[in-house]
Amino acid sequence: MLFRSWTFYRFKNFDTYYYLGGQELAQYTGRVAENEIADIEQLFDYKINGRFQFIIYNKLTDFEQSNIGLGTDELNTNTGGLTKLVGNKVLVYFDGDFRHFKEQLRAGIAQVLINQLLYGGSVKERVQSAALINFPDWYIKGLITFVAKGWPLEDDNQLRILLHEKGPKHFNALCEINSTLAGQSLWNFVVNRYGPSTISNLIYMSRVNKNIEGGFVYVIGSSLKELNKNWKEYYTPIYQNDDTLFTNTNEKPALKFKKKTQNITQLKLSPDGNSIAFIENNSGKYKCFIYDFSKNKKRKMFKGGYKHEASYLDEANPLIAWHPSGKYLTSIYEKKGHYKMDYFELGKNIKRTSSKFYYFDKVLDFSYSSNGNDIVLSGVQKGQSDLFIFNPRTKFTRQLTNDRWDDNHPKFVMNDQYILFQSTRFTDSLKTTSFKQKEDLFTSNTTDLFLYDCLNFSPKLIQLTNTPLVNETNPLMIDNAHFLYLSDVSGIKNRQLATLDSTIAFIDTSIHYKYIFSSESVSNYSSDIQLQDVNFNKTKTAFINFYNRRFNLFTITPQAILSSRISQLNKTTRRKSIDRDAIPKERQNDVNTILDVTNQDNPVKLADTIKHASNSFITDFPKSNNSEKGNTSISIPTPKDSIISVVSDSTFYQMPKQRNYDVTFA
């Protein structure tokens, strides 16, 4: 395999190991890891012993094949589970989303630090300490997750759904359902109630007392029983108030999924809207079905994968899309480390044609042009996700974007002249970027919508949304003037309807148009819309929503959407908190504005930080370099809630010398 030949960069406090195709990811890790290590050390008031070794995989399937740590006792004492970890080796992979990649880095750093704090630095110390101290999963995994990504909206909504109506009545019951989310929510409660410095104090006193009960009693004066009660009293009124602001789905479900925890990762309406294809993914083992609305029957098309208990799920494998003719369904999937493209010709007997698809490390999404001759896709090459046009007949691929911003969910629109897509970019100019320039590391932590003129291959994009705190995802076009997309502007992922209009800006040798984009809410559901799609004929849309304690499939016509505008936009408590605290007062009106896309302001730079005082306990842990400065700034990240990630103060960054690593990790 390609990843047997390793190369690495040696930085001051860590090394980044990579193989063919992963150099750019190693450079990115080198730019951001130093700040993340210092930030997490400051949070825990502890200096990590030893050097980090970040082992970087280009994709999830390579990551799953790793044999690092096999045959040692270290995996048996790995108290985490969110990131593969052996000693100070942190294993991460790239799935096309730099936000998730950075979360993995933070989770791995936090995991190493927590292991050292609780169990000591060496394997011998960990084994001895593990026999004396038993920390539950919610404590360790919840803390690692909270340090990695804070308390984002999707986790807040997941907890609200679990606690809704007939959900778990107490904290321990929630732990049986989802111990990581339970612990993450408890640490969020502790930080909000007692401050971020409480984290390091609790860990230290838990280690001293050899149990977590003693730590909580000594630091916050509450037993675990009292703490769990306070946790419930903290979240219950918040979610009860939120529930009064939103409504359940009133439509009758077109299809009810049998399993309450069913993961539907793909949803594609047939061109005529009479049937729908979807992927059921059960912990890595997937099945593709086509459901006929009129016959109320579903037909299995194919299956694959294998079931595993890992915490990661590849939602982009497999991918499916209908050919505009409706005669066959196309699937792009990964098997044994290689991509394939299969065509399923529909009829009484399904005819399957398979071809190899060599071009990408990973494919994130794809869709057909209206004539079926071309495919637009989001593909990963050399550690970045870009847009490409692929011709299935000639096998010719043309790259449209080539930069460090994450581009996904592309669709041909407006008679195939434009491509509608979502991206983390904050500029409307296309250019080639690298991680050596400081400006190329500015990345929006939320996604906006863009239009690309693929007829003229314009270097200038049309930016449709500019919402620094809001994620716009899954864009669709339901007629010539209206877009439909999902937005968490209310704190819950609901439908937004957007209208694109144009006026003449000026005339010289040709007419130049100025585009105006406005949006409004057209759904007010109390739970996230997971996926949505519209058929080629624009007669039906479909979406998946949580209803009656399970996920269900609903359909609605575009005409009904156009007439279902919401007069007042309600927001969850968590969304209000983000809007209030995360941006300067002078920019608070930017959260949901009508955007003139020809005259945009650049997003402001913002660090999502929490101020706190020095720890009140004197510990025997080594102090971090910044711990003697009195009042300091600690970052409890909510990556998708902050505006811009900035990782370096230098304009140009000189990478260290590349070194070959000849001995395979084992």
Positions of predicted regions on the chain:
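Active-site-proximal alpha-helical
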Residues: T16, I40, F135-D155, R160-G221
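A flexible loop/linker signature enriched in serine peptidases of the S9 family
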Residues: N157, K260-T261, I279-F289, Y306-D314, ...
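Outer-membrane beta-barrel initiation region
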Residues: L606-A666
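Short coil turn/linker residues within repeat-based beta-strand modules
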Residues: K295-K297, K336, G347-I350, R393-F396, ...
